């Protein structure tokens, strides 16, 4: 029985053939030889287009194959280095590219079969060159975002070529002379697709060419980085060809052999070209140089590139006789990531700091810069993060008013030209899968995808996982499934284990490429059910590291302290304490600000105790104590700003002072402070002063809620304080409820019926819950559908309950698209119910540009909870409602015009550079 490729390569060092072009030159072919009769009228010169000889002079190509086989080649390469549309476009022969590849493979197959025996099989490697274009570099020095070709175009071109090679009889696909790893990824991707289509196993040989003595590719990667970039793929071999002679290639070959889990190939040039562009090495002089490769156990396959002929191959065949082949290294037991350089996530790194500032959802400055197309300054943010110690850069372009796919591509392309940034891997962060794939198609290194989850079920999860593997990336897996986000220890480990089994058993993903995010959630919110969030994350981290071998742990650390936005010291101190404990249990990735100024060891002991009480949930009053500490620090900072002595800042405003105001002011202040101690007495006094109980709600209590909204909006109140306010409001409502009911019995009817929901994809509900309280206090009947509510459920319930209006809430960027979807579904259902939109990521501009155009009814953006009853009141009045709609239509039209005008004013990067001020003319 004929030996297989895998059997032969384990048994001995295999011989690859030599140069095709060098051999063709020996035949002194003319322009007419290249053209043949068929292409006699094709415009342009054809001489030098060696691949067309497969069609016009197949005898020459066959003769060369025979010579190499006679010299002892085990593997001959097809004459198809440029047999694809991109290269053939230079000769106006795009339509002949597939035929060239097919003919080339058939010629090689026929020759190999003539020499093959069961004991000495001969193999055909389908040659796939890099093309004359690159996916990773700009053709225009003044426009780093530009690309002459994109990944998918290259993929399609390669797929056509590779399918033809397989049809023609190729045993192996040789992706050679790789100078851009992104080009190589496209070729590997196409090869794996050809395998799926044909049902054939296609061993992939990958051969890199380094461009200088520093050992980097033309696109800037080190060989270690290249190895990491392709480490997810099932390669047969990796090696080097072209560029250098054997001595110059040797140190780089040793580097590959030292780290690669694949077989190693080497086919150097016949030395370095002389001043005439010719090669001076002979077969006899080069054989001893290649002997060093063999004797040192560096290679499994050797052959020749530029300048080599069948004589070189005959010499190489002699020197490998009886020699042991290289033994590939075991697969790395650590995660490999790469930009231009390798990031080997070894235990001594301990923690991979993922820079968080290149995120439009998390940085207002970065969002503004991207909106303004100020990429130079946006790039400087990435540069600073790397300088501050970020080992990976997170990039997120998810904003309702941005073309996220285009901005992701643009920014990744630009930073690819900045070596001080591009040296580190990127984390492509988006809630939109098309944005993630667009980003992956721009990255030659091994990136991290952030993220996938089981939220949409196993089928989508597995599909996304296969895409991750297709592009050679690692992946963040959120602990989120069809039931929702995991918030307890038990749910976190349940989802993590399920996802791990699916990824490793059904998709075949390397466990080292899996990074679990067990959900860093806000603590110290004032809600007891949130108190264990950090501790449960830490416990889940420990369990995952012990029970799911190879997997890593990450988290968006800033989420932890969301309650204290505006107080940077408290936030950074919370992060430091959390990371100290989480890293100790195995958390090894984190999306953080690398420039954070607070270290765990620098936190004063008294503060540390309070912070750890919160993070580890060690006492029931931990949140209150942290709020007090935050207030104290805030006062200290304000005193320092005002020039006061640092030690004289512990005084707080005396509570009795606000008690001296009138009852309306006292009620408002009580809400702002979240103090319910005096509520009974104050409300009794107010009931005597106001005609109806509801007037108290709409008057002083709503004034207090308005103030809360203002303070929270500008970061001067923290989430736990807002929750405390909401509870105080609920207490006030409970006290007033009997009086409200009595007023209703006297003829007052419900103000209206409101359906409220946090839209699909969003699990956050605190804002919605506050609106619920406020609306209920204003005599509205509220039907709360909860979180993660699909559009169809909202529509169905609205019809069934005959509601007067709908309130949509969302805290995260994906909610914006889902709100558009809800409005679209309502339009399709023929509804014209008013929609109130609110939440942290929402804006009036988004409503004007995205939601209002798809819905004929009223859509109104509500800035904060306190405004909802005022808006609802206008919506419930038939006459005012018409007037309100006309006002909104006019305002939205103006906003759209302003936005369009602003977009027109923004020059393109090219235009801006052309219009730059020249001080020297």
Where are these regions (language model features)?
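Domain-level signal for soluble alpha/beta catalytic cores
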Residues: 1-921
């Amino acid at each position: 029985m004929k030996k297989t490729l895998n059997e032969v390569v384990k048994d001995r060092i295999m011989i690859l053939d030599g140069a095709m072009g060098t051999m063709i030159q020996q035949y002194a072919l003319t322009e007419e030889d290249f053209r043949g009769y068929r292409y006699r009228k094709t415009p342009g010169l054809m001489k030098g287009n060696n691949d067309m000889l497969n069609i016009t002079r197949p005898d020459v190509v066959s003769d060369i194959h025979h010579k190499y086989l006679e010299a002892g080649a085990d593997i001959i390469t097809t004459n198809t280095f440029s047999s694809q549309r991109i290269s053939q476009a230079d000769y106006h022969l795009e339509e002949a590219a597939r035929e060239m590849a097919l003919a080339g493979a058939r010629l090689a197959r026929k020759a190999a079969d003539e020499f093959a025996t069961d004991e000495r099989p001969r193999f055909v490697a389908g040659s796939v060159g890099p093309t004359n274009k690159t996916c990773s570099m700009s053709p225009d020095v003044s426009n780093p975002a530009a690309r002459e070709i994109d990944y998918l175009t290259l993929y399609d071109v390669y797929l056509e070529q590779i399918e033809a090679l397989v049809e023609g009889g190729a045993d192996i696909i040789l992706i050679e002379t790789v100078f851009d790893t992104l080009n190589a990824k496209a070729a590997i991707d196409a090869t794996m697709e050809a395998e799926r289509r044909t049902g054939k196993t296609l061993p992939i040989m990958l051969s890199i060419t380094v461009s200088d003595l520093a050992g980097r590719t033309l696109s800037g990667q080190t060989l270690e980085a290249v190895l990491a970039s392709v480490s997810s793929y099932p390669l047969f071999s990796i090696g080097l060809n072209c560029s250098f002679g054997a001595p110059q290639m040797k140190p780089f070959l040793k580097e590959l052999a030292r780290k690669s889990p694949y077989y190693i190939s080497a086919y150097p040039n016949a030395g370095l070209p002389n001043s005439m562009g010719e090669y001076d090495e002979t077969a006899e002089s080069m054989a001893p140089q290649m002997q060093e490769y063999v004797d040192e156990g560096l290679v499994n396959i050797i052959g020749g590139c530029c300048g080599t002929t069948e004589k070189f191959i005959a010499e190489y065949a002699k020197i490998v006789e009886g020699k042991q082949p290289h033994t590939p290294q075991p697969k790395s037991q650590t995660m490999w990531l790469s930009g231009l350089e390798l990031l080997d996530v070894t235990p001594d790194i301990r923690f991979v700091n993922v820079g968080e500032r290149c995120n439009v959802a998390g940085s207002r400055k970065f969002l503004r810069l991207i909106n303004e197309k100020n990429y130079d300054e946006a790039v400087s943010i990435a540069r600073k993060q790397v300088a501050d110690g970020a080992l990976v850069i997170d990039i997120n372009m998810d904003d309702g008013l941005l073309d996220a796919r285009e901005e992701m591509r643009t920014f990744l392309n630009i930073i690819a030209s900045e070596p001080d940034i591009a040296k580190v891997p990127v984390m492509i962060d988006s809630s939109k899968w098309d944005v993630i794939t667009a980003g992956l198609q721009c990255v030659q290194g091994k990136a991290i995808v952030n993220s996938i989850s089981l939220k949409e079920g196993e089928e989508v999860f597995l599909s996304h996982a296969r895409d991750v593997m297709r592009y050679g990336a690692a992946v963040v897996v959120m602990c989120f499934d069809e039931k929702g986000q995991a918030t307890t220890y038990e749910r976190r480990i349940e989802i993590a284990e399920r996802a791990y089994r699916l990824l490793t058993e059904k998709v075949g993903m390397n466990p080292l490429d899996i990074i679990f995010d067990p959900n860093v959630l806000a603590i110290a919110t004032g809600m007891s059910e949130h108190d264990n969030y950090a501790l449960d994350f830490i416990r889940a981290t420990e369990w995952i590291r012990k029970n799911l071998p190879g997997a890593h742990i990450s988290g968006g650390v800033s989420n932890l302290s969301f309650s204290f936005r505006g107080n940077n010291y408290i936030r950074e101190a919370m992060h430091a304490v959390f990371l100290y404990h989480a890293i100790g249990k195995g958390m090894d990735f984190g999306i953080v600000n690398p420039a954070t100024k607070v270290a765990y060891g620098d936190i004063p002991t008294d503060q540390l105790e309070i912070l750890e009480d919160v993070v580890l949930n060690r006492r029931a009053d931990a949140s209150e104590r942290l709020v007090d500490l935050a207030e104290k620090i805030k006062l200290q900072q304000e005193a320092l700003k005002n020039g006061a002595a640092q030690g004289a800042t512990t005084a707080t405003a005396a509570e009795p002072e606000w008690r001296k105001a009138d009852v309306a002011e006292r009620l408002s202040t009580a809400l702002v402070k979240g103090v319910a101690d005096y509520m009974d007495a104050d409300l009794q006094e107010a009931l005597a002063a106001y005609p109806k109980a509801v007037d108290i709600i709409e008057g002083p209590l709503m004034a207090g809620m308005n103030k809360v909204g203002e303070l929270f909006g500008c970061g001067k109140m923290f989430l736990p304080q807002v929750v405390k306010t909401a509870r105080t409001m609920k207490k006030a409502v409970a006290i007033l409820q009997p009086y409200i009911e009595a007023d209703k019995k006297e003829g007052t009817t419900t103000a209206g019926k409101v359906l409220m929901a946090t839209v699909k994809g969003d699990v956050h509900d605190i804002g919605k819950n506050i609106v619920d309280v406020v609306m209920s206090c204003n005599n509205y009947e509220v039907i709360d559908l909860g979180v993660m509510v699909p559009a169809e459920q909202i529509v169905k319930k609205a019809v069934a309950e005959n509601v007067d209006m709908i309130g949509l809430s969302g805290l995260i960027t994906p909610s914006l698209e889902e709100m558009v979807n809800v409005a679209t579904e309502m339009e399709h259902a023929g509804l014209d119910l008013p929609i109130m939109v609110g939440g942290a990521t929402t804006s009036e501009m988004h409503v004007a540009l995205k939601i209002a155009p798809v819905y004929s009814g009223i859509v109104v953006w509500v800035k904060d909870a306190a405004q909802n009853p005022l808006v609802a009141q206008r919506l419930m009045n038939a006459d005012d409602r018409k007037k309100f709609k006309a006002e909104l239509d006019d305002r939205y039209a103006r906003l759209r015009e302003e936005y369009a005008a602003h977009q027109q004013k923004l020059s393109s990067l090219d235009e801006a550079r052309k219009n730059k001020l020249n001080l020297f003319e």
